[in-house]
Each structure stands twice: as C-alpha cells, then as structure tokens.
Amino acid sequence: MGELKCEVLPENFDQYDLSFKLIVIGDSGVGKSCLTMRATKEYFEEFYSPTVGFEFFTFNIKINNKCIKLQIWDTCGQEVYRSLISSFYRNSSLAIMVYSIDNENSFTNLENWLNDIKTQSNPDVKIFLIGNKTDLEDKRVIQYEQGELFSKDNKLDFFIESSAKTGLNAKTIFIEAAKLLYSEHLKYKDRASRPGSLADVLPVQKLDNEVNNVRQKKRCCGN
C-alpha cells in the first residue's frame, strides 16, 4: 500500500468520506480530556474539571485524499459512571486506554479497563495504550518499559507516552489511530472485492445521530 500521506484538517471541517468512533478510557485524573483537547483544539487547561459522564471531540484528517472523521467519546473514570460508560463501547472502532506515569493505581487498573473493552466491544476493536503526563518525569513511578511490556503481552495495537501539558505525541495518537483504521478499511474493501468473497466492507459509521441522542439524554439527566 505504501506510505500513507496525512494532513490534519481543521476541527470544524464537516465533509468526510469515512467516520470512525473512538472511546477514550482510564482512571479519573490521568488526563484523558486534557490530552484529547490538546490534540483536537491545541489547547491545554492546567486545572481541568473532571469529566461528568462523557464529552465529545472531533479529529479530522485527510489520508491519501480521503477525509476521515474521528468521533472521540471521552469518558470519565469515576466508578459511579462505570455502568453508563459501558454502553459507549458499542460500535467503537478503537479504544484508547490512558494511564498516568505518576499514578501506579491507574496502571494497575488497566487490567479492568482492558477486560471491559474485551467483554463489551466488538471483537475486532483496536486498542491503544497511552502513558500520559511525561512532564511529571520527576514523579514517575511507571517506567516506559512497563507500559511497553503490558502492550506487548496483551497484543495491543499501539503504545506511546505523551503529555497533554507539553503536547508531546498528543496529535500522534489520533493520527496513528486514523492511519490504522483507514488501513483496516482498505483490507476489508479488498477482501470484499474478491470473487466469491462474503467479507463485509467496513461501513462508514453514521455516528452523528448516536451522538445527538446521547447528548439529549445527558441534558435530561442534568435537569
């Protein structure tokens, strides 16, 4: 297939050929929202209020002349919302698990988050692992090699460390996600085009209605 040519598009770009749903999960306080906001809005807020339930972000990118929209569901990590979050795994193409390099519990709890993905998502879901807050190097308790080993042992699709504060690898995470999902789309498409093949083409996911429905429910719950 050769090297993919990528160009990040503005957040408000609304014309796209493919759309994929991503879910960002992990313990509360690991920087999920800040990391996603840094990647999508190029903005960082030092004291960001914890996510209540969920938030939505969009990351747009052009790959080989195809415009791709990543619909990012940023979830809270608080136990009280765990049952609510479980419904968001449905139709997710990729899950991003985030831990903080200065928080041992957030790393230990990856086993629980991974189990949630495997039991509640579709069997073909891709999984990324992100070690966040590299700007807190002096407080590091989880070494890079530990994250790398966890990713390898569990056959995850991608591992990298990042910092929402400095912006390190924030966009890279979503660029790599888009590249992987686009490549998978081409594989499905090629498989389905072969004579006698029964393989399904990975569909363009129509997520806007799902987002609007969930937003409406969130507003109702907040009243």
Annotate the PLM regions:
Residues 57, 82-87:
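Conserved alpha-helical scaffold flanking the Walker A/P-loop in AAA+ ATPase domains
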Residues 40-67:
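Switch I (effector-binding) loop of TRAFAC-class P-loop GTPase G-domains
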Residues 62-65, 86-91, 118-123:
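Conserved catalytic network of the ASCE P-loop NTPase/AAA+ motor domain
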Residues 61, 72-73, 96-100, 128-132:
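Conserved beta-strand segments of the P-loop GTPase G domain that flank and frequently precede/overlap
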Residues 1-29, 33, 63-67, 123-223:
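Conserved P-loop small GTPase signature centered on TRAFAC-class small GTPases
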Residues 68-83:
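Switch II (G3) loop of P-loop NTPases
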Residues 92-111, 121-124, 134-141:
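Conserved Switch II/interswitch segment of TRAFAC-class P-loop GTPases
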